[in-house]
Amino acid sequence: MDIKKDNAMYMQIAQIAAGRSYAKRLQVGCVIVKNNSIISFGWNGMPTGYDNCCEEEIDGKLVTRKEVQHAELNAIAKLAYNGYSSHGASIYITHS
């Protein structure tokens, strides 16, 4: 096992997840890994039931809407919903 290669691979997967975001200003992806297996992933976006518009224009600038959920929150919520534990897991995030 090559840790540097594994880290690079998980970051690439997080980048792919970021591409799923509808955000125009900043797309963020997240992967949660435990025992060398991906147990969850997510991206920033609007909550279920909202439109997929993550920004609003204020004074000519795109501003992230307050309802946007972080990629980490989405990944952890999916993990918990499916009954998994994040104890001992690593999280890879494309933006900090």
List the model feature ranges, each with a label.
Residues 2-27:
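Short, basic/aromatic recognition patches
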Residues 27-42:
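Short beta-strand scaffold segments in enzyme catalytic cores
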